[in-house]
Swiss-Prot record:
Membrane topology of this protein: Multi-pass membrane protein
Catalytic activity entry: AMP(out) + CoA(in) = AMP(in) + CoA(out); 3'-dephospho-CoA(in) + AMP(out) = 3'-dephospho-CoA(out) + AMP(in); acetyl-CoA(in) + AMP(out) = acetyl-CoA(out) + AMP(in); AMP(in) + NAD(+)(out) = AMP(out) + NAD(+)(in)
Name of this protein: Peroxisomal membrane protein PMP34
Segments in the Cytoplasmic topological domain: 1-9, 88-104, 182-202, 302-307
Topological domains annotated Lumenal: 31-66, 126-160, 224-280
GO BP: ADP transport; AMP transport; coenzyme A transmembrane transport; FAD transmembrane transport; fatty acid beta-oxidation; fatty acid transport; NAD transport
Name of the coding gene: Slc25a17
Cellular localization per UniProt: Cytoplasm; Peroxisome membrane
Spans of repeat Solcar: 7-92, 99-192, 200-294
Domain notes: The N- and C-terminal portions are exposed to the cytoplasm. Lacks a typical peroxisomal sorting signal. A region between helical transmembrane domains (TM) 4 and 5 and TM1-TM3 or TM4-TM6 are necessary for the peroxisome-targeting activity.
C-alpha cells in the first residue's frame, strides 16, 4: 500500500502530466488536422499542411488551437492517472528489482484500462468542443452549440443520457495497447542503452520516445479512427446506440470505412497523427525525465525504480 501512495509515484504522475501538457501545446495544430481528417471523410485535402492552411483560411488564424483548454485539461488528468497507476503498479510488482518487457506491457495495459474508465467522459467532451464551429464537408454531421466544458457535460447528459459520456469506450479499451506498447518499447530501449552508459542524454530520451510512439501509433491507428468517430457521435447516418462502442459498431465502422475509401481509409490522417504524436511523445518523455530527475535531486531522494 505504501508503494501505491508513495511520494515517488506522485512525482512521476505530476512530471508526466506537465510533460504531456507542454508537448501537446507545442504540437496542438497537428492534432487538429489529424482529427479533421478522421472525422470529416469528405474533405478533399489529404496532407497535414493543406488541411491546416484550409482551416486557417476558412476559420481564422487561431482555429488550429480551437478546443485547446478542454484537450489540455483532459490530457493533464489522463496522464496524471496513467503515470501514477503505471509507476505505482510497477513499484508493487517489481519491488526494487529490474523490470522486464513482459511486466512493462502488463503494467501499461492495466494502467491504460484504469485511465480509460476514469477519463473517457473528458475526452468525449473535448472532442466535441474541438470540432464545434468547424466547417465540415460531410453534411451528415450534426452541429453542436456548447458554451464550455460544464455546458457540454450538461447537454450531453440531458439530450443523450449519461452513458453517452462513455461513447467509444470499447475501442478505447482496445487502444490501451497503444500506451502499453509505447511504454514497453520505451522502457526496453532505455534498459538497453543504460547497459552501455551510466546516464541517458536528452537526445537519447527524445529519440527512444519518438521510436516507441511511432510503433504504437502505426499498429493501433485504425482503432483510433473509430474511437474519434464514436467520441464525436454527431453523424446522422449512425442511428444505432454508440454508447460504449460495442464490438458490432466497431466492426461496422471499420467495414464502412474500407468499403468507401479502401484499406487506406483506415489510415486517413496517419501522417498528421504520426507527426503530432511522435513529436509530442518525444518532447513529453524528455520533459518528464528531466523534471523527475530534477525533483528527486532537489528533494534529496533516490528513485527506487530500476529499469
Amino acid at each position: 500500500m505504501a508503494s501505491v501512495l508513495s511520494y515517488e509515484s506522485l512525482v512521476h504522475a505530476v512530471a508526466g502530466a506537465v510533460g504531456s501538457v507542454t508537448a501537446m501545446t507545442v504540437f496542438f495544430p497537428l492534432d487538429t488536422a489529424r482529427l479533421r481528417l478522421q472525422v470529416d471523410e469528405k474533405r478533399k485535402s489529404k496532407t497535414t499542411h493543406a488541411v491546416l492552411l484550409e482551416i486557417i483560411k476558412e476559420e481564422g488564424l487561431l482555429a488550429p488551437y480551437r478546443g485547446w483548454f478542454p484537450v489540455i485539461s483532459s490530457l493533464c488528468c489522463s496522464n496524471f492517472v496513467y503515470f501514477y497507476t503505471f509507476n505505482s503498479l510497477k513499484a508493487v510488482w517489481v519491488k526494487g528489482q529490474r523490470s522486464s518487457t513482459g511486466k512493462d506491457l502488463v503494467v501499461g495495459f492495466v494502467a491504460g484500462v484504469v485511465n480509460v474508465l476514469l477519463t473517457t467522459p473528458l475526452w468525449v467532451v473535448n472532442t466535441r468542443l474541438k470540432l464545434q464551429g468547424a466547417k465540415f464537408r460531410n453534411e451528415d454531421i450534426i452541429p453542436t452549440n456548447y458554451k464550455g466544458i460544464i455546458d457540454a457535460f450538461h447537454q450531453i447528459i440531458r439530450d443523450e443520457g449519461i452513458l453517452a459520456l462513455w461513447n467509444g469506450t470499447f475501442p478505447s479499451l482496445l487502444l490501451v495497447f497503444n500506451p502499453a506498447i509505447q511504454f514497453m518499447f520505451y522502457e526496453g530501449l532505455k534498459r538497453q542503452l543504460l547497459k552501455k552508459r551510466m546516464k541517458l542524454s536528452s537526445l537519447d530520451v527524445f529519440i527512444i520516445g519518438a521510436i516507441a510512439k511511432a510503433i504504437a501509433t502505426t499498429v493501433t491507428y485504425p482503432m483510433q479512427t473509430v474511437q474519434s468517430i464514436l467520441r464525436f457521435g454527431r453523424h446522422r447516418l449512425n442511428p444505432e446506440n454508440r454508447t460504449l462502442g460495442s464490438l458490432r459498431n466497431v466492426l461496422s465502422l471499420l467495414h464502412q470505412r474500407v468499403k468507401r475509401f479502401g484499406i487506406m481509409g483506415l489510415y486517413k490522417g496517419l501522417e498528421a497523427k504520426l507527426l503530432q504524436t511522435v513529436l509530442t511523445a518525444a518532447l513529453m518523455f524528455l520533459v518528464y525525465e528531466k523534471l523527475t530527475a530534477a525533483t528527486f535531486t532537489v528533494m534529496g531522494l533516490k528513485s527506487t525504480h530500476k529499469h
